């Protein structure tokens, strides 16, 4: 049996069309466009590439994009001042701080300056707390994208055993909580887990978020399981692979996200959806 491929590019296209329609409706109703401010420190080519992708996405959908690139010698105080000013600026609905920051800058203190209502990356402790309590807040985009792939493909989650391999604050932990909120039985595994293969093999849904290429192999996966791969690993030969050994798992699983073209494309649309949601909530709270 060969797994169904959970195609992130196709889903991202559908989501973008839905989001464009929702954004245009917002603009017509409110007379303004949702707006995103990206804050980053100059000098990181990967950060520049990511920013270009976000800018293009905003333009396609109708979101106003502003780029706040700070010089390499930026101090903690300057960074916090920039974020704080954007938090107070009523014309800005979403703030995205590009992480990781260069050495010498404290990301936790910088993130604390983001108004939680504008935290479109879902990284502020306030939004993490809402997620842990099962209350709606702004959700981190990577796990939100993975959930969207599962839900839109009608993958049953209720009562299913999901093993999340990886406990990062940005992907593993929030993904485990999102699955829990959908009534899955969730196990979190990580680098210290004893007999990882056995823990993974017991799962109906396997989520890989470790940053270790090819960690999850076909012999670790229960036949018919659904596999979500958040890994983005660039090999020495330039190939991009996930945390799942696709070639061996594709013959065992019932459904699998490819890398590239799986969770990645959906993640970027989730960011833009958060910008619209943040704008909607901010305008609604002003009207009360």
From Swiss-Prot:
Keyword line: Amino-acid biosynthesis, Histidine biosynthesis, Hydrolase, Methionine biosynthesis, Multifunctional enzyme, NADP, One-carbon metabolism, Oxidoreductase, Purine biosynthesis
One record GO biological process: L-histidine biosynthetic process
UniProt xrefs under Pfam families: THF_DHG_CYH, THF_DHG_CYH_C
Alphabetized GO MF terms: methenyltetrahydrofolate cyclohydrolase activity; methylenetetrahydrofolate dehydrogenase (NADP+) activity
Residues binding NADP(+): 166-168, 191, 232
A cellular component term, taken from the record's GO annotations: cytosol
Entry-linked InterPro entries: Aminoacid_DH-like_N_sf (IPR046346), NAD(P)-bd_dom_sf (IPR036291), THF_DH/CycHdrlase (IPR000672), THF_DH/CycHdrlase_cat_dom (IPR020630), THF_DH/CycHdrlase_NAD-bd_dom (IPR020631)
The enzyme's E.C. designation: 1.5.1.5, 3.5.4.9
Pathway it works in: One-carbon metabolism; tetrahydrofolate interconversion
Catalyzed reaction equations: (6R)-5,10-methylene-5,6,7,8-tetrahydrofolate + NADP(+) = (6R)-5,10-methenyltetrahydrofolate + NADPH; (6R)-5,10-methenyltetrahydrofolate + H2O = (6R)-10-formyltetrahydrofolate + H(+)
PANTHER family per UniProt: C-1-TETRAHYDROFOLATE SYNTHASE, CYTOPLASMIC, C-1-TETRAHYDROFOLATE SYNTHASE, CYTOPLASMIC-RELATED
Subunit structure: Homodimer.
Record-stated family: Belongs to the tetrahydrofolate dehydrogenase/cyclohydrolase family.
Role according to the record: Catalyzes the oxidation of 5,10-methylenetetrahydrofolate to 5,10-methenyltetrahydrofolate and then the hydrolysis of 5,10-methenyltetrahydrofolate to 10-formyltetrahydrofolate.
UniProt-recorded name of the protein: Bifunctional protein FolD
């Amino acid at each position: 049996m060969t797994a169904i491929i959970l195609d992130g590019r196709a889903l991202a296209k559908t989501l973008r069309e839905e989001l464009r329609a929702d954004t245009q409706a917002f603009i017509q109703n409110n007379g303004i466009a949702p707006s995103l401010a990206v804050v980053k420190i100059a000098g990181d080519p990967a950060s520049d590439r990511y920013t270009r992708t976000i800018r293009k996405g905003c333009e396609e959908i109708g979101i106003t994009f502003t780029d706040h690139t700070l010089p390499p010698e930026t101090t903690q105080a300057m960074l916090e001042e920039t974020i704080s000013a954007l938090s107070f600026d009523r014309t800005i609905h979403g703030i995205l701080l590009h992480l990781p920051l260069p050495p010498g800058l404290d990301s936790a203190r910088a993130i604390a300056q983001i108004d939680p209502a504008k935290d479109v990356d879902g990284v502020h402790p306030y939004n993490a707390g809402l997620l842990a309590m099962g209350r709606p807040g702004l959700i981190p985009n990577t796990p939100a994208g993975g959930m969207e792939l599962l839900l839109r493909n009608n993958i049953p989650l209720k009562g299913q055993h999901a093993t999340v391999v990886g406990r990062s604050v940005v992907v593993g932990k929030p993904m485990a909580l999102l699955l829990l909120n959908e009534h899955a039985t969730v196990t979190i595994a990580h680098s210290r887990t004893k007999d990882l293969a056995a823990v993974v093999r017991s799962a109906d849904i396997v989520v890989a978020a470790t940053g270790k290429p090819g960690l999850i192999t076909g012999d670790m996966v229960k036949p018919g399981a659904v596999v979500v791969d958040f890994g983005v690993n660039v090999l020495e030969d330039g190939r991009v692979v996930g945390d799942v050994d696709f070639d061996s798992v594709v013959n065992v699983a019932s459904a699998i996200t490819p890398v590239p073209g799986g969770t990645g494309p959906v993640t970027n649309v989730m960011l833009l959806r958060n910008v619209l949601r943040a704008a909607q909530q901010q305008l609604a709270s002003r009207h009360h």
